[in-house]
């Protein structure tokens, strides 16, 4: 027999007893102003991850806090971050970045919701390198092949992530249109100091096997719009625009379609004949290349690409804009187009961020 021991506790309101295994994970509710849509969020997931998990369509781009595509108005509640996302200061007071923000309370946010077709599933897939074409001194075109009898479902303008062996990811826009799905086409620019792009340019061989996650992103063509469309690209920002324009042709979208492609010099127009061919074949399409550091024999448009757009269309209130390229170009273009009367709901953009291999940013 063991002796009976009576233990008494004196508990007051200042006493807290906890055990790690007994603690519950905190959860909150996020409400989208206007639509009233709500979703739950756990304390260990970002606002964007919680939304995607529950098929709530929030806009996003880089997913690393740099491009600002996901920016939302924070109407009530508290959002915390692990570090300071680079774009947080740029988006201004009263805003949050759902791709990096964690809920510290119930939230009410103001954001443009986007369509999330549930039938298009994000998948982890193996791919085989079918072709590596060096288009210019610093751009290659990759063609990737999925396993036999498989096709990737996606919307024009989305991107994929390469999943590297060390756990890092590298993001690249899909350059082909959804109807043309025998191969996945990517346009990859060499990044100084980027180990992945060094490998792509110097060592990647046909038949190499890689792993991808796709499709990702909300930079997609809105095929139900009848407004004239402006596509503005910088460098390899042409890649997602190519897929969107080809899809627009396939869908017989009859409104005017204008492509402005900004690069430094003429050699940086890495597929110069393709948009010229589109202009010959489609009466509603125009192509305007713009050089910021023009060659001596260049007789076309010069300067910044967004300035060329505004020179041709000073009033953008009746247009849709699709814009992809480096963050400075996207930032300048967005501000200029808003000032020219373009409604924010008509503006779609994808801001490319180039990684060094010291961090987790994509070699887009």
Regions found by a protein language model. Name each.
Residues 22-107, 256-364:
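Reductase modules of NAD(P)H-dependent flavoproteins
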Residues 75-78, 112-114, 165, 215:
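Short, surface-exposed secondary-structure boundary micro-motifs
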Residues 121-209, 226-227, 263-265, 290-294:
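Ferredoxin-reductase
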Residues 157, 237, 326:
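Short, conserved phosphate/pyrophosphate- and ester-handling motifs at nucleotide-, phospho-/glycolipid
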Residues 215-225:
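A short, basic/flexible loop-to-alpha-helix module at the beginning of a structural domain
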């Amino acid at each position: 027999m063991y002796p009976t021991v009576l233990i008494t506790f004196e508990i007051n309101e200042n006493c807290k007893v906890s055990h790690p295994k007994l603690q519950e994970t905190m959860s909150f509710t996020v409400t989208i102003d206007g639509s009233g849509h709500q979703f739950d969020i756990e304390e260990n997931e970002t606002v964007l991850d919680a939304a995607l998990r529950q098929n709530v369509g929030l806009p996003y781009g880089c997913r690393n806090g740099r491009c600002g595509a996901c920016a939302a108005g924070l109407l009530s509640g508290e959002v915390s971050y692990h570090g300071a996302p680079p774009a947080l200061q740029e988006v201004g007071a009263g805003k949050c970045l759902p791709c990096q923000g964690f809920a510290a309370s119930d939230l009410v946010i103001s954001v443009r919701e986007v369509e999330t077709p549930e039938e298009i599933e994000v998948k982890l897939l193996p791919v085989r390198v079918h072709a590596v074409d060096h288009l210019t001194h610093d751009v290659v075109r990759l063609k990737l092949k999925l396993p036999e009898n498989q096709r990737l479902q996606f919307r024009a303008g989305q991107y994929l992530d390469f999943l590297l062996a060390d756990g890092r990811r590298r993001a690249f826009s899909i350059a082909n249109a959804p109807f043309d799905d025998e191969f996945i086409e990517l346009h990859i620019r060499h990044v100084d100091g980027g180990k992945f792009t060094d490998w792509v340019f110097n060592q990647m061989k046909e038949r190499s096997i890689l792993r991808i996650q796709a499709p990702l992103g909300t930079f997609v063509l809105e095929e139900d719009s009848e407004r004239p469309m402006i596509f503005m690209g910088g460098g390899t920002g042409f890649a997602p625009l190519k897929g969107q324009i080809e899809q627009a042709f396939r869908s017989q979208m009859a409104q005017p379609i204008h492509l402005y492609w900004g690069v430094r010099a003429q050699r940086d127009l890495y597929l110069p004949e393709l948009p010229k061919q589109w202009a010959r074949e489609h009466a509603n399409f125009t192509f305007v290349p713009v050089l910021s550091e023009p060659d001596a024999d260049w007789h076309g448009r010069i300067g910044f690409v967004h300035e060329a757009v505004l020179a041709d269309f000073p009033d953008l209130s009746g247009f849709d804009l699709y814009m992809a390229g480096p963050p400075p170009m996207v930032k300048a273009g967005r501000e200029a187009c808003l000032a020219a009367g373009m409604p924010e709901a008509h503006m779609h953009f994808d801001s490319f961020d180039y990684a060094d291999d010291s961090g987790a940013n994509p070699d887009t």
